[in-house]
């Protein structure tokens, strides 16, 4: 006779198996319409984006056109709301690019089931007030959104369309930073918000995808402690709610503004990449996230051979925010960089760990959205000249500032990169040794933070922070003469910051350090925008870094 405990375990096992089978059956259903809700404030609306700009970003070509197979219902805006007349085909609304456009294309490429998007968003709204489900104030977004969603779903019912609500993509929190009470209680308010949606939509298993507030914006600098507080609140929810996921966005593009170039909105490129992030987060939950394995054909070095390891590090342009492989195809004499080079082992962690290599891969394009960094042209140039083996390890976070790389970090502790960076370098060295190579760390090639050059307090402290990073890295890596090659593009030219001669300050640090090489990247191809380099600029930067190293041999 079975004991009760044995019977209980057997019952639990059957329950789990039934649950797995049930979930698999749900995902295998390719006929039920999957409805996604997009909600939030201005960076969910798509503020400061333009449909005409889509053509500037080749991976997203065509997203200005209607997606006829995707249903769309929307209510967007504050005082003057733009509403769809029932369900329509998904397309930009009033020349604005929202994340739903790239989300839909990415999802429909991965699944056969039809999808629909309901979007309710308004700039300048806060969770503590407008979106408060219990006591909404201001624009009373929660009851408005609930009514709009119910109305859209009722229309599907009237058409006898079989559907299910698949998830909610939520991007909001910037305005809660400006209210001390809302900021302090953001996590608590968000938890309540999710619970009320599940209750009011009668979907207890409703998934939420919570978008990070992008630290690449000006608010990620001048409001650093406040933005950090919101992120802590978001993570407090996503870390305990198994149906809520935290979606990083700090590596996406950000609009280039006037004056010093900084902005608080994602703009066209950022919105397109923003949507892909939500799509990948969703596809991850159903086991359909796209992958592109890039294994080495064979280990490129013989046992005992000497290998020079080059570490590339930095922010927006070292990551390659606006350098696209499609642009590389059009550059004369550069198309060979598109091919994987199996003679150079390449390891990377980009976007603050948003994407990492599967061990060592061949040198080749491996960015987030068909992007690449200076590593391609750098690796090609160095590899042609050196007799020893060449390996490249790249560690970047385009949403970081120099302070995040310093040993002491900042009050926004979750943004501190220094420990992860040093660990990444150590692991790269050790892995090569474990494979039987004699390894030399040939140098760290760091491209100075672009955003830092556009905000006075960070521009003013750039040289001291750089020196702290360099000095401590040599101590922690046990290499007192470790070469640092620090490249600097022309610093932001604007009256707000021109009183700080950051170039002279970096020169002073370099002149006192025989192993710090200051590379003035002042002759790169002319750029259309401040701060960011395009495809030609990133290629030229890699070649300049290689030239600087090779000239010192």
Where are these regions (language model features)?
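Cell-envelope and extracellular/periplasmic
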Residues: 26-553
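Bacterial N-terminal signal peptides that target proteins for export
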Residues: 1-11
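Bacterial N-terminal signal peptides
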Residues: 10-20
């Amino acid at each position: 006779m079975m004991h009760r405990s044995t019977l209980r375990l057997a019952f639990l096992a059957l329950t789990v198996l039934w649950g797995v089978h049930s979930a698999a059956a749900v995902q295998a259903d390719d006929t039920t319409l999957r409805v996604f809700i997009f909600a939030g404030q201005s960076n969910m609306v798509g503020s400061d984006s333009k449909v005409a700009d889509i053509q500037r970003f080749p991976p997203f070509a065509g997203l200005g056109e209607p997606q006829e197979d995707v249903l769309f219902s929307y209510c967007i805006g504050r005082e003057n709301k733009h509403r769809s007349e029932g369900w329509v085909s998904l397309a930009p609304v009033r020349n604005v690019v929202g994340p739903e456009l790239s989300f839909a294309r990415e999802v429909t490429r991965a699944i056969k089931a039809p999808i629909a998007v309901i979007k309710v968003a308004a700039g300048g709204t806060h969770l503590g007030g407008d979106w408060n489900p219990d006591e909404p104030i201001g624009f009373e977004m929660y009851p408005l959104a609930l009514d709009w969603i119910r109305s859209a779903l009722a229309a599907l019912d009237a058409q006898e369309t079989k559907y299910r609500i698949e998830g909610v993509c939520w991007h909001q929190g910037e305005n809660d930073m400006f209210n001390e009470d809302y900021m302090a209680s953001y996590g608590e308010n968000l938890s309540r918000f999710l619970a009320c949606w599940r209750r009011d939509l009668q979907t207890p298993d409703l998934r939420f995808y919570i978008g990070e507030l992008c630290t690449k914006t000006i608010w990620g600098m001048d409001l650093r402690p406040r933005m950090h507080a919101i992120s802590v609140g978001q993570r407090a929810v996503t870390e305990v709610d198994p149906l809520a996921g935290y979606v990083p966005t700090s590596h996406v593009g950000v609009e280039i503004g006037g004056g010093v170039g900084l902005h608080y909105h994602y703009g066209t490129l950022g919105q397109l990449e923003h949507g892909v992030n939500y799509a990948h987060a969703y596809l991850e939950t159903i086991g359909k996230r796209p992958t592109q394995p890039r294994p080495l054909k064979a280990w490129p070095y013989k046992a005992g051979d000497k290998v020079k390891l080059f570490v590339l590090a930095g922010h927006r342009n070292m990551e390659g925010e606006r350098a696209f492989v499609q642009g590389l195809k059009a550059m004369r004499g550069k198309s060979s960089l598109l091919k994987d080079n199996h003679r150079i082992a390449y390891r990377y962690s980009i976007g603050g760990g948003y994407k990492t290599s599967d061990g060592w891969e061949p040198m080749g394009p491996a960015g987030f959205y068909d992007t690449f960094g200076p590593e391609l042209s750098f690796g090609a140039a160095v590899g042609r000249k050196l007799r020893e083996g060449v390996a490249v390890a790249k560690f970047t976070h385009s949403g970081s500032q120099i302070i995040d790389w310093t040993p002491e970090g900042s009050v926004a502790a979750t943004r501190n990169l220094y420990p992860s960076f040093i660990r990444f370098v150590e692991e790269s060295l050790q892995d090569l040794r474990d494979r039987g190579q004699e390894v030399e760390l040939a140098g760290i090639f760091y491209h100075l933070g672009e955003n830092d050059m556009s905000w006075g307090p960070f521009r003013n402290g750039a040289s001291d922070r750089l020196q702290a990073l360099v000095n401590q890295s040599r101590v922690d890596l046990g290499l007192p003469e470790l070469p640092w090659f620090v490249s600097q593009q022309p610093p932001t030219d604007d009256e707000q910051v021109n009183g700080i001669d950051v170039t002279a300050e970096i020169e002073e640090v370099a002149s006192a350090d025989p192993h710090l090489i200051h590379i003035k990247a002042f002759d790169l191809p002319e750029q259309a925008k401040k701060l960011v380099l395009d495809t030609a600029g990133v290629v030229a930067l890699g070649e300049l870094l290689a030239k600087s190293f090779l000239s010192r041999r």
